[in-house]
Each structure stands twice: as C-alpha cells, then as structure tokens.
UniProtKB/Swiss-Prot annotation:
The chain crosses the membrane at residues 21-41. It is found in: Cell membrane. GO terms for cellular component: plasma membrane. This is Transport protein ComB. Keywords: Cell membrane, Competence, Membrane, Transmembrane, Transmembrane helix, Transport. It is a single-pass membrane protein. NCBIfam families: bacteriocin_acc. Required for induction of competence. It comes from Streptococcus pneumoniae (strain ATCC BAA-255 / R6). Belongs to the membrane fusion protein (MFP) (TC 8.A.1) family. It comes from the Bacteria.
C-alpha cells in the first residue's frame, strides 16, 4: 500500500472513529426519536373495578303463595328450568277456606254489579227497572233521584207562577196608568182649545171640560181686557197642573211595565242532576269491575293452590334464589323466593354491573367503551366488549363510602353464553380517554389525574 494512503486512513480514523461519533451521536438520535414517539404516540387512559354479570331483564318474581310448610323444594341457584317445571310444593292448609271466601266475595260483587246496572238503566230512562228491593240501597238511591227531580220541577213551577202573577199585576197597573195618561192628555187638549177660543174670540163646544170657565169669562164681558187675561191665566194654570200630572203618570207608566223572564233552566238542571248520578254510577261500576277481576284472580290462584299446592315455572329461564329464604322450610305468603332470569343462550345478551366511587364516576359518561374480563378461571378467561348504558344519578351508601352504580349491556356469542353464568365476578376496565405518552408521564411525575 502506498504511504500516502496509510496517512489518509489514519487521519480518517482519528477524525471520525472517536467517542463522540460512537456514543453521543447515537444516544442523541435515540433521545430525539423517543421524545418524538412520546409526543405523537397515545396511551389509552382507563379505570378498573369489579363487576358482576346480571340479567338484562327479569322474567318473573317467584313469591311464596302459602304460609304452609314447604314439602318439595326444587329451587337451586343458576338452575335452568322449563315452563311448567315443579319448583315448590306446599303442605295443604287453609287454601280451601280462602277459595270459598273468594267465591262468596265474587258472587256478592257480581250481584252488586247487576243491581248497579239496574240503577244505571233506571236513571237513563227515568223509570224504575228494579225487579225487587235490593240490599245495596240502589233502589232507594233512584227514589231519592226521582224526589230531587220532582223538587226541582215543583220549585221551577212555583217560581214561574209567582213571576206570571207579578207580570199580570204589572200589566194591569200599566194599563190603568195608561188610561190616566189618555184622560189627562184629553183634558189638556180641552183646556188648550178653551185657551185658543178665549184668545181668538171663537166659540167653544159645550162638552169641552173648560166650558164652564169659558162661560164665566163670557158673562163677565169679553170686551174687558183684564177679564180676558185672567181667564187665560186660569186656563194656563189648569194646563200646567195637568201637564205635571201627565209627566208623573208617564214616569209611573215606564216603571210599571217591566216583565220578568220565566225560569227556563229546568231541563238543564234535570240533565245536570242525571249526569251527576250517572257519573257516580259509572265510577262505582269501574271500581266493581276491578274488584271482580281481583276476586276472580284470587279465586283462580287459591283454586290452583287447593288443587295442586305447588308453584311451577311460568316460562323457560334460569333461577336466582333469594338468600334470605333459600334454606327456609316455611316462608310467609308474598315473600320473594327467587327470580327467574332469561337463559343466556336464548337471550343472547347480559348486563354488566359495577360500582365506582364519586371521585372516579366523574371521569366516565354514558357511551364510554368498557371491557369485562372474567377472573374465576385464569386459564379460560372470557373477554366482553361493551359500552356504558346507564349511570345512577344518586350514590349508594356503603360502609366504604358512596358509590355510583353503572351498567353496560353486552351481546353474547353462543360460546360466551354457554361458558358465562349469572353472578360471575370479573374486572371491568373503562376507557376514559387518550393521552400522549409524554403527557402521561408528566402527569404521573406531577401527581395529576
């Protein structure tokens, strides 16, 4: 090799194969890469809590139907039952007496309904349709209605008679005053005619009311001006007096002719009375119909208990027992024995239920994604993906604090439904958002949520 090449190679090695080029530069490049990755890449933020598998709906509440001792009990947790399967059989007791009581009550209610329908028809047609006196007092109610209607008619008739009498008296008074007005007007005309005769010197008919005054004037000398003035003044005084009386008569005439209107609301009052009674009857019929349905239902239930003395499954499903009564041989009537859940295989969905503290619940909302993982069998875990469907508005108080109930409904495959059981516990992971790795580690360092 030529010596100049050796010198060049040595120079290259010294310049580029040093500590800076071998360590610092690669580390700097790595740091830049990691910083860029931490800035761009995102990490899912999540919460985790325990959750249980619950039914999406409850098919039926199985309640004790007797206070008697349980002889046969086929209730088992998570047991798959078919419609009609025997669940509980009781020792026969007082069901027979109760069945008779329901039957007697039902007969009485039906008779009461029949009598009430008689009352309804009687009210509608205004005639008594009761074949005989009833023990519920409905016929007496109809008689009371007839009496009230009669009182209304009598009151209205009496009122109209009084009004007619008053109107007749008013008409008669007005007619009499009208006659006085006519007579007074005739007198005024006579005196006005007499005045004109005195003033003009013409003759006056003898039948004129002022003829005597006219004659007196004529006898005193009609040529005397003073006599003429006195005669005219006397006539005018009579006219003024008559006009004053006429004005009074006219005022009396105007006030005396008022006619009162006859009472015309009888039909509406009678219709209102009938409507009130019919409305009350309608309400009682509705109430009786409800009572009859209840009595028929009770009679049917007691009859079934009397005949069979057992509880059977109302439909296909899975049993969930009430832990408070699962080991009891005597359970009070009406107490919950178990609940019937839909089969997971047939329903194809389930509900995941969990509880979160008030601190964590603020970080989630309806629609957030969740993942459920079973924990009872580490070698055969199930993973279910869903979204939050509901969050309780109020917290549930416990010894450990206040917790909010959250639910997430999830669909199941046939394989998942076969392996899953109601009540199975697992971990529920809720994705609350995303952060870059840089922001995540900064928040961790600064102890931020």
């Amino acid at each position: 090799m030529k010596p100049e090449f050796l010198e060049s190679a040595e120079f290259y090695n010294r310049r580029y194969h040093n500590f800076s080029s071998s360590v610092i530069v690669p580390m700097a490049l790595l740091l830049v890469f990691l910083l860029g990755f931490a800035t761009v890449a995102e990490k899912e933020m999540s919460l985790s809590t325990r959750a249980t598998v619950e039914p999406s709906r409850i098919l039926a509440n199985i309640q004790s139907t007797s206070n008697n001792r349980i002889l046969v009990n086929h209730l088992e947790e998570n047991k798959l039952v078919k419609k009609g399967d025997l669940l509980v059989q009781y020792q026969e007791g007082a069901e027979g007496v109760q069945a008779e009581s329901y039957a007697s009550q039902l007969d009485m209610l039906k008779d009461q309904k029949k009598q009430l329908e008689y009352l309804q028809k009687s009210l509608q047609e205004g005639e008594n349709h009761f074949p005989e006196e009833d023990k519920f007092g409905y016929q007496a109610t109809f008689r009371d209605y007839i009496s009230q209607a009669g009182s209304l008619r009598a009151s209205t008739s009496q009122q109209n008679e009084t009004i007619a009498s008053q109107n007749a008296a008013a008409s008669q008074t007005q007619a009499e005053i009208g006659n006085l007005i006519s007579q007074t007007e005739a007198k005024i005309r006579d005196y006005q005619t007499a005045k004109s005769a005195i003033e003009t010197g013409t003759s006056l008919a003898g039948q004129n009311l002022a003829y005597s005054l006219y004659q007196s004037y004529k006898s005193q000398g009609e040529e005397n001006p003073q006599t003429k003035v006195q005669a005219v003044a006397q006539v005018e005084a009579q006219i003024s007096q008559l006009e004053s009386s006429l004005a009074t008569y006219r005022v009396q005439y105007a006030g005396s002719g008022t006619q009162q209107a006859y009472a015309s609301g009888l039909s509406s009052q009678l219709e209102s009375l009938k409507s009130q009674h019919l409305a009350k009857v309608g309400q009682e019929l509705s109430l009786l119909a409800q009572k009859i349905l209840e009595a028929e239902s009770g009679k049917k239930v007691q009859g079934n208990l009397l005949d069979k003395g057992k509880i059977t499954a109302s439909e296909d499903g899975v049993l969930h027992l009430n832990p408070e009564t699962s080991d009891s041989s005597m359970v009070a009537e009406g107490t919950l024995l178990a609940q019937l859940y839909p089969s997971l295989e047939r329903e194809g969905k389930a509900k995941l239920t969990a509880y979160l503290s008030s601190k964590d619940v603020a970080r989630i909302k309806v629609g957030d994604s969740v993942r459920y993982t079973t924990t009872h069998d580490a070698g055969n875990q199930l993973f279910l993906d869903s979204t939050i469907t509901s969050i309780d508005a109020t917290a549930t108080k416990t010894e450990k604090g206040n917790f909010f109930k959250i639910e997430a409904e999830t669909n199941l495959t046939s394989e998942q439904a076969e392996k899953l059981r109601y009540g199975v516990e697992g971990r529920l992971q809720m994705i609350t958002g995303k952060k870059s790795y840089l922001r995540y580690y900064l928040d961790q360092f600064l102890n931020k949520e």
